[in-house]
Amino acid sequence: MKLRSGEAYWLLKNGIINSYPSLRENIVCDVLIVGGGITGSLIAFQLSGEGYKVVVIDKRDVSLGSTCATTALLQYEIDEPLYRLIDIVGKEAATDSYKEGIASIRKLERLVYKMGKDCGFESKASCYVAHDSESMERLSKEFESRHSMGIDVTWLTEWQLWNQYAVNGMGAILSRSGASVDSYRLAHNLIAYATRHYGLKVYDHTEAVDFEYDTRKNYVYTDDSFLITADSIVYATGYETKDLLNDKIVNLNSTYACVSEPIINLPKHLSNTIFWDTQDPYLYLRSTSDNRIIVGGADEPFHNAKRRDSIIEKKGFALMEMFGEFMPTMNIIPDFCWAGTYGVTKDSLPFIGPHPDFPRSYFVLGFGGNGITFSIMGMKIISDALAGRSNKFLEYFKFER
């Protein structure tokens, strides 16, 4: 599956950071992680750091799938508002999922500090804007729901929103628990640290093409006919997992993004806040460490790569128009535009944990607008699953829900 197209900003900015060899021999490991994007790198960092003998394989170069196309806003907010999620999955599961998102962003901040390498991580506020009067009623209800659950939020009136941020909206929820990151560089940093300090092994251009199981082991055959014998497998294959599972667990769409030219004297409110609104599909934006603005959205309900690619330019103009309406006093010049695949689940929660059709195997599928945050949650969830420890999120995020 072609996961991205156009000039993905993170790849253009960073180039190929590290390359790894393809697998050229039969190997044995404790845990095989299939997928070397941001999810696979987070899980590999966690498990190798706990002493497991971990191998990561990726059919591309590390993080050249959807990881280098994501806009990498880090949000605790889930695509399904809290008050609606409570109706779908219950108060405890919904509230726990939101609060764990906050904890995950702080966890990543500590992890980045531990590695000591720049990946563009910046803690930011998050501003969720009502774009019309009807959505303001829903957003007001969402504010009350979050506030009643002890989440630190502030309500901004239309006047406050304009006065503080020059944003055109009817009102907004302001949260202190957001961030942004260069996800492509972060993934490379995680893998480099784990290979250097924890003995992680990584193989690029190595595709798993066949899987066999017995009562004790998993046997994975690669496209070059080498064998990987693993006690456990973790699938971190993102949207391509749809081709592996018979279950219809996600609807795939196309999403678009543009990054501006660098902005001299970028306003502080743009550098320290991420924004998104209540439109469907919603508009979202963030700044980068080199003073650009990334604008994303304009989703389409298909994922055919040829069709998606054919309208990148058109979608770029649409995003610029949407940005102009959202922040009319700010003028930006687009530099690069690109497209990627985006998925949504029935309840906007991820699928993390075992699957009945895959013995001794686990999936970390952080679908949705805050997929990176879900993947950070997956670090502890998969660690607990492998060790036989209980974890309530294994129940919340299971396939059979």
Language-model-detected regions and their locations in the chain:
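Flavin (FAD/FMN) cofactor-binding and adjacent substrate-gating region
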Residues: 2-13, 80-86, 110-189
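Glycine-rich active-site loop/strand segments that organize a redox cofactor
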Residues: 70-100
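N-terminal Rossmann-like FAD-binding beta1-loop-alpha1 element of flavoenzymes
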Residues: 27-56
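Active-site substrate-recognition segment that forms the wall
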Residues: 106, 114-122, 208-213, 226-357
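Extreme N-terminal leader/targeting segments of oxidoreductases
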Residues: 1-31
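Helical element adjacent to the flavin cofactor pocket in flavoenzyme catalytic cores
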Residues: 172-231
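Glycine-rich FAD pyrophosphate-binding loop
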Residues: 49-69
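C-terminal catalytic lobe of FAD-dependent flavoproteins
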Residues: 309, 324-401
